[in-house]
Amino acid sequence: INDYPSNNLISKANVELGSIYLKEKNADEAEKYLIKVLDDYPDAEQENELAIELMLEVYNLRNNLTGYYDWLISRGIDVSVQEKDSSLWRPVVLARDNGDCSNQIEKASYYLDNIENPIREISAHYFMANCYLNDQKKNEALFHYDFITKKPNNNYYTEALKYAGEITFDANDYKNALAYFSTLEDVSMDEDDVSLSVKGQFYCFYYL
């Protein structure tokens, strides 16, 4: 690289070096070579495209995905809202697939905090709620389930109503539990859900 800086293979070599440093989790060294490609070899289209894609991993290693999009904008590269949404959502799904609830909550919170109108807002709240419930953090879980119940006709609506009803009932909050169970009976097509909602309402009325 140093002996033949103008060789047309140098841009490819820099990309490969950047990729190697990324595999070693060395974001700073990777960035140095990737930026060199973009600054010194702007006409190497394929290598420029690869360098831009790999820079996403640089910022991911720094746990700063939003910084990646600021960087793109600073270089005059167009960023679609959907692309940014998908990139910030990907770590949430990866954490869920790995069964890592702590990381899932962290990534879902980051996603919600850094996307103005998140496309997967309901899913993020649902994943967080389930993780909190698994950890027996019921108040935190209820916050997210309740959020979902306030946005009807989503994929997790009946599940959120059911869990919110059970959590509030266990907390002796029979008034709110009754509301959740009543709505669940009205909207669910599942026999088990309807049976649970009727039973829940019966006991709520009993204790009120």
What is the predicted role of each segment?
Residues 1-208:
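Acidic, polar-rich low-complexity tracts and alpha-helical solenoid repeat scaffolds
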